[in-house]
């Protein structure tokens, strides 16, 4: 129905807004790291690791040492992956990890 199609479109639009927000916050954090000459770390866990019951406060612990914490999806758009890969790259999550890792290796403070 039209209502379902409209709802699906709205959901996809919102998902894109969320991705954009995450990327912009990642870029903002990277600028902060550079401006304040501090370190950052990219936590590249599974998406469910954002749950405090699973990550046991690790991001907050790292941050308490004045180390900025970023997620892989906040920096993956900044990296490129040389292809072909020597691994099977069939999942989007792993593709983002490869991009994030390739970006991180170019940064002295990450």
For each of these PLM feature ranges, what is it?
Residues 1-110:
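An N-terminal assembly and electron-transfer interface module characteristic of large anaerobic redox
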